[in-house]
Amino acid sequence: MEIAMLELLIGLVVTFAVGYFIVKGYKPAGILLTAGILLLILTGILGHKVLPGQMESTGNLLTDAMEYVKYMLQNRGGGLGMQIMLLCGFASYMTHIGANNVVVKQFSKPLSFIKSPYILLVAAYLVACLMSLAVSSATGLGVLLMATLFPMMTAMGISRPAAVAVCASPAAIILSPTSGDVVIAAEKSGLPLHVFAVETVLPVSICAIIVMAAAAYFWNQYLDKKDNTPMEKVDLSEMEVKSPAYYAVLPFLPIIGVFVFNGETLPGITLDIYTIVVLSIFIGVLVDYITKRFNGKQTLEDLEACYEGMADAFKGVVMLLVAAGVFAQGLMSIGAIDNLLHLAEVAGAGGIALMLILTGLTVAAAIATGSGNAPFYAFVELAPSLAAKMGLNPAFLIIPMLQASNLGRTISPVSGVVVATAGMGKISPFEVVKRTSVPVLLGLVTVIIGTMVLVPMHA
């Protein structure tokens, strides 16, 4: 018991230290990486396995910590990191060839009757939530929205922090009935997938999204006034648009590709986001080449903007993701998350109190680790046995936990989606968290109330 409390205390102290130094202006990537390596080394000193189960030890706790950094560079640098770099490169290329300006010019005309940028913000948020049905990865969706919707939102008068928050938050509430989290939750609840996803989770999700959209309207309006946030609305009369009108389609090619190459629209053809973005860049280059009357030299010079955008993404976003991953592994390997689980088991509370405890612990773990999946997968294992002991409906415990893990990720300064969108928007992750905090907290309250009203407590 004493060792368990020590492990939890170490996790809390290091987490608070990370927050302190980042607030003081230290570079987040360096702080997170240092804290993660420290936690991994302390894990070895306490006698635990430093590396996750699928990795073999190097034989030394110090080199094990370095081995995990290498693993994250390969895994996130070459996986999710490559996706981010491709999308950032694509976005930079679209800006360079003038396609984003064409989009703003074209879309501003029909939307000019909407005078409030905050109504546009709500509309963008609802569109982004629908996009989560097609793109299951929170970070992938956030980066995709930053590459496509973000330039248009800021040009139409939505402040940069508010626009980043919109891109970071659509995956906070799960809508997709085929999401891996939903499938596991349905299994643990003992309900058929269609009953759990459509009849149980979906009504709660819709209520939460409506509340979060309204909260985003008022909260961002309040913060913009309070912080005197500069608006970047473009004066259309002064906007220089040299590219032809059909360039307006180009920035949306990745989004179009997600729907076209999903294996159903064109049966037999399924492409992942990496290939879709590469194809989008290729189409953009081809269109630009034809538009410039087959001036190959100029077209290839313009393409350099794509490579520069990818390089900037590695420095500003991907290394942050790597560092955040090392930090999250440090927290998990030292036992901080397992000890939170133990607290839930020994709490011995009533139905509603137990649901609140499990939900609170899931949110706390999601904020600390930056992961929406890991806390839920860990805590959901407890729900069926706890529900059986107390005669509760497992779904009553699981639905708030399911949504809480994703909501918690959206207010974590070390989560992939917050780090990635903040990096692309060139603002602090803490600014994103500030913008998403009130909508997320109200969304969580809505989920809890919705569960209590719509889901039977007892089996």
Swiss-Prot record:
One of its GO terms (biological process) is C4-dicarboxylate transport. GO terms for cellular component: plasma membrane. The keyword Membrane applies. Signal peptide: none annotated. Disulfide bonds: none annotated. It catalyses: fumarate(in) + succinate(out) = fumarate(out) + succinate(in). It is a multi-pass membrane protein. Its main location: membrane. GO terms for molecular function: antiporter activity; C4-dicarboxylate transmembrane transporter activity. It comes from the Bacteria. The chain crosses the membrane at residues 3-23, 28-48, 79-99, 118-138, 139-159, 164-184, 195-215, 243-263, 267-287, 317-337, 347-367, 437-457. It is found in: Cell inner membrane. Belongs to the DcuC/DcuD transporter (TC 2.A.61) family. Responsible for the transport of C4-dicarboxylates during anaerobic growth. Catalyzes the uptake of fumarate coupled to the export of succinate. This is Probable anaerobic C4-dicarboxylate transporter DcuC. The lineage of its organism: Bacteria, Pseudomonadati, Pseudomonadota, Gammaproteobacteria, Vibrionales.
